[in-house]
Each structure stands twice: as structure tokens, then as C-alpha cells.
């Protein structure tokens, strides 16, 4: 089976879509409900993992062009979610989505408009 090549613009669009999903879920979920509801936690964690996995596969050219994105940090988050899920701090995850994802989304939307 041939490997499909996904371009940076498509990856960034996918990141934005999953960020929007996370923000929507977090904004409609109190922290206590987030902690208590395993389905919501898993859904949000998967969407965050998709965002971070997509970031890993962005080309170095794009990463070097847009250094305002913390590309390496997203790889670290992805590794924790994928390989050390028990070490995931739910409060940090919740607050990261609530506080940092809107800013990340805005930056990615700007990049999306600038790349071909």
C-alpha cells in the first residue's frame, strides 16, 4: 500500500479542527466533570494527541519559518499522552486547552493563510 503524503497546509487545517473540538469540549465542561468523565477525558486526550502528532510531521521548512509555534513542546505532550498516559496531569491538560489552545489556534490560522 502506498504511503499518502499529507502537505503542511492539510496538517495545519487538521490541527485547527482538533483544537476547536478541544476548546468547545473544555468550555462546556467544568474541571471536576472533566476529571470524573473518562469518555470526555479520552476524547479530549485523543484530539490533543492528533494535534501534537500532526505538529511532529510538519516539515522542517515550515517549522523554521514559523518559530512562534512551540513545535518541540507539542512532541513532548504527544509522547506523554501516547506512552506515559498515567503521568498526564489532568489539571495541566485542562488549563492548557483553556488558556493556550485559543492562542495556538490563532497562530495556526495565520500560518494556514500564509502557506501554499
Model-identified regions with their sequence ranges:
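Solvent-exposed interaction patches of small proteins and small membrane subunits
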Residues: 1-116
Amino acid at each position: 500500500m502506498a504511503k499518502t503524503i499529507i502537505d503542511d497546509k492539510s496538517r495545519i487545517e487538521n490541527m485547527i479542527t482538533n483544537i476547536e473540538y478541544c476548546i468547545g469540549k473544555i468550555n462546556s465542561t467544568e474541571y471536576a466533570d472533566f476529571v470524573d468523565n473518562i469518555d470526555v477525558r479520552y476524547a479530549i486526550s485523543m484530539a490533543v494527541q492528533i494535534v501534537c502528532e500532526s505538529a511532529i510531521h510538519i516539515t522542517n521548512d515550515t517549522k523554521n519559518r514559523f518559530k512562534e509555534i512551540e513545535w518541540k513542546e507539542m512532541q513532548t505532550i504527544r509522547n506523554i499522552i501516547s506512552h506515559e498516559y498515567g503521568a498526564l496531569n489532568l489539571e495541566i491538560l485542562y488549563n492548557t486547552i483553556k488558556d493556550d489552545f485559543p492562542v495556538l489556534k490563532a497562530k495556526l490560522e495565520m500560518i494556514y493563510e500564509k502557506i501554499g
